[in-house]
Swiss-Prot record:
This is Actin. Keywords: ATP-binding, Cytoplasm, Cytoskeleton, Hydrolase, Nucleotide-binding. It comes from Phytophthora megasperma. GO terms for molecular function: ATP binding; hydrolase activity. One of its GO terms (cellular component) is cytoplasm. It comes from the Eukaryota. It is found in: Cytoplasm, Cytoskeleton.
Length: 375
């Protein structure tokens, strides 16, 4: 490993791909993890039409494309599309030759083993990287917050999970994974906006709803009181201008949408809310370390960006925790990118340099090396 060659850090989320160089304090490229296929045949001669559009370009042309997300619930479901996204990341976004840089990738905890192996295989065989490493997202978020102990609630677009980390070690037996995240909230918002008479159905319209969700929603401190308040007056109403110039008004949808994180039964899911997941995670840990975990609940990921979520988490977890226990929720302002930032910190540490899986390691042992070298 040369010292002057920067490692590439790629955080492949279900919704957004964050990529950049180790040592930087923010990702250079952030683009949607979308592959768009044209719905119609191109007829204009001389237009350089492609067979696939990726990321922002797919987003811009979404009206004539069918959009696909290759990562669902944190797991890659379409490897051909995933290769397109990676190659777009290296060649178009970062403009680097992958064979010259070690690559750090991230993944959701409790992912299928085959998923990791396939990632490793593609990196070494398709992109010929000199070295690579796969790390669990939540652990990286904790690095970014400057802690070595804490319970991380990481909620992105496709998957949420709570991971307890003590003195830098993730405790795998206590990880709770929740397949409920930003995309489910967007779907739910599409549904409840339909009740208002606004119809959003296509993959392109879903992106509009995602934008409404990101700009206007918030978490209510007390859901029932907020519902009554919304019913009594229109003080909570906000308007949003659609791309065609029409203006729609949204009211209680603003806080009904993120409420799903705390009450998954609202969308017919039997799973527990995020506050209970964090509580279950802490309860699965040794009794001696629980206080440290309660005092360091770190939020990370885009679906923890809702205003009011920190206070609401504090309230809900204090209810569940033992009476004298102080619950402290940490909401770093850069938490949307904290997984990437943690990866950037890790890959630039001198002590990390002997951890990489090298091309030689891979040639000797094959894809299964990833389970031995990457914890």
């Amino acid at each position: 490993m040369e010292d002057d060659i920067q490692a590439v850090v790629i955080d492949n989320g279900s919704g957004m791909c964050k990529a950049g160089f180790a040592g930087d304090d923010a990702p250079r490229a952030v683009f949607p993890s979308i592959v768009g296929m044209p719905k119609h045949l191109g007829i204009m001669v001389g237009m350089n039409q492609k067979d696939a559009y990726i990321g922002d370009e797919a987003q811009a042309k979404r009206g004539v494309l069918t959009l696909r997300y290759p990562i669902e619930h944190g797991i890659v479901t379409n490897w051909d599309d995933m290769e397109k996204i990676w190659s777009h990341t290296f060649y178009n976004e970062l403009r680097v030759a992958p064979e010259e840089h070690p690559v750090l990738l991230t993944e959701a905890p409790l992912n299928p083993k085959a998923n990791r192996e396939r990632m490793t295989q593609i990196m070494f065989e398709t992109f010929n990287v000199p070295a690579m490493y796969v790390n669990i997202q939540a652990v990286l978020s904790l690095y970014a917050s400057g802690r070595t102990t804490g319970c991380v609630l990481d909620s992105g677009d496709g998957v949420s999970h709570t991971v307890p980390i003590y003195e830098g070690y993730a405790l795998p037996h206590a990880i709770v994974r929740l397949d409920l995240a930003g995309r489910d909230l967007t779907d739910y918002m599409m549904k409840i906006l339909t009740e208002r008479g606004y119809s959003f159905t296509t993959t392109a319209e879903r992106e509009i709803v995602r934008d409404i969700k990101e700009k206007l929603t918030y978490v209510a401190m007390n859901f029932d009181e907020e519902m009554e308040k919304a019913a009594r007056s229109s003080t909570l109403d906000k308007s949003y201008e659609l791309p065609d110039g029409n203006v729609i008004v949204i009211g209680n949808e603003r806080f009904r949408t993120p409420e799903v994180l705390f009450k998954p039964s609202m969308i017919g899911r039997e799973c527990t809310g995020v506050h209970e997941c964090a509580f279950q995670t802490i309860m699965k840990c040794d009794v001696d370390i629980r206080r440290d975990l309660y005092n360091n609940v770190v939020l990370s990921g885009g679906s923890t960006m809702f205003p009011g979520i920190g206070d609401r988490m504090t309230k809900e977890m204090t209810k569940l925790a033992p009476t004298a226990m102080k619950v402290k929720i940490i909401t770093p302002p850069e938490r949307k990118y904290s997984v990437w930032i943690g990866g950037s910190i890790l890959a630039s540490l001198a002590t990390f340099q002997h951890m990489w899986i090298s091309k030689t390691d891979y040639d000797e042992s094959g894809p299964s090396i990833v389970h031995r070298k990457c914890f």
